[in-house]
Amino acid sequence: AATGATPSWDDPATQEVFEAIAHDVEASVSAAPPLLPGALRITSALSEVGLAQAIVSASPRRIVEKVASALGDVFTVLVTGDDGVGAKPDPLPYATAVERLDLQPQDCVVVEDSPTGAASARGNGIHVVQIGAQKHFPADPGLVVVPDLASITPHLLLWAQR
């Protein structure tokens, strides 16, 4: 029964459930991770013009590495749930990525598909291109909302960074 209580990550039962889910996800992405339409195109285009890219995810590193590989291994930095830097919307995951990229937040643009991820990036002053025009997002001059990844171009990312 649902209690409304937040599970503790220190609880062995919570860890067991998380590991079971991670195992199922890993099995499903092993052969060919399902990529959102436009993901490979945009990561390839950014790589071709020499822009550093990072993935920031709460997923285990082994899963993130498989997705990164499917996207062409163009990512300089992977920040994963295994890094112990907290979870979105905490700003620390994106702060860690910016630090590892040796950049400043104002020099970065984040593409996010979740409101908690957008909040994490915005907590560092990073501009965000948010996927999902049908969702509700607070008015924020640092947030651009597009319907899907296919709508993103390198020019949009440069404009969003302004």
Question: What is each model feature region?
Answer:
Residues 1-4, 53-56, 70-71:
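N-terminal-biased segments
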Residues 2-41, 49:
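Metal-dependent phosphoesterase signature
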Residues 31, 56, 86:
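Glycine- and other small-residue-rich loops at beta-strand/loop junctions that grip anionic moieties
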Residues 33, 55, 107-109:
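Residue-level marker of alpha-helix boundaries and capping positions
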Residues 44-47, 51, 60-162:
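Asp-based, Mg2+/Mn2+-dependent phosphohydrolase catalytic module
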